[in-house]
Regions:
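Short alpha-helical segments and helix-capping/turn motifs at coil-helix boundaries
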Residues: 48-49, 123
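Generic non-transmembrane alpha-helix signal with a bias for helix starts/N-cap capping motifs
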Residues: 47-48, 141
């Protein structure tokens, strides 16, 4: 039988549970910015009105490299059945993306430094001024920040947690 050797008393280790609860209390007492970002009272560093113009968009292109889009891609893959929008993740230099250029996309360009070569190349190939573009980058002068200004696109400043 599969349940041989499994005893319910093994799941009732209150001492360890209380130890975990105490550790959690200590973490919550610290004013860690990442933990604070999960609270209902957290204030974003941007105006959420910026995001409203993307509500009507059906297709999104996320342009970035490595950690800049891996988390987003993981969340999308996990919730794919529930998400009603289409996402195309562009995280390398791929010739096949040129075929997708004709479709209408809203572009989310993500680069913490704003100087990642592959992101800049894909940005120059895939975006134009008539697209809906949203840049997520540090609040400093970088190539990506200057492109956002040139395209008159919205910029959300990347937080350094």
């Amino acid at each position: 039988m599969i349940t041989n050797g499994i005893y319910l008393k093994n799941f009732k280790l209150k001492r360890k549970s209380s130890k975990v609860a105490n550790i959690l209390k200590v973490i919550l007492k610290k004013k860690d910015p990442i933990i604070q970002s999960l609270s209902k009272n957290f204030k974003n560093s941007f105006d959420t009105k910026i995001l409203r113009k993307f509500n009507s968009s059906r297709n999104f292109r996320i342009i970035g490299m490595g950690g800049s889009i891996l988390g987003t891609e993981a969340i999308y893959n996990f919730l794919r059945d529930k998400v009603k929008k289409n996402f195309l993740f562009i995280n390398d230099l791929d010739v096949s993306i040129m075929n997708k250029k004709k479709e209408k996309y809203s572009n989310l360009i993500v680069s913490k430094s704003g100087e990642t070569i592959e992101t800049i190349v894909n940005l120059n190939i895939l975006t134009n001024k008539s697209d809906k573009n949203l840049f997520i980058t540090e609040n400093r002068k970088s190539y990506l920040y200057e492109m956002a200004e040139k395209l008159k696109a919205e910029v959300i400043h990347h937080n350094n947690f």
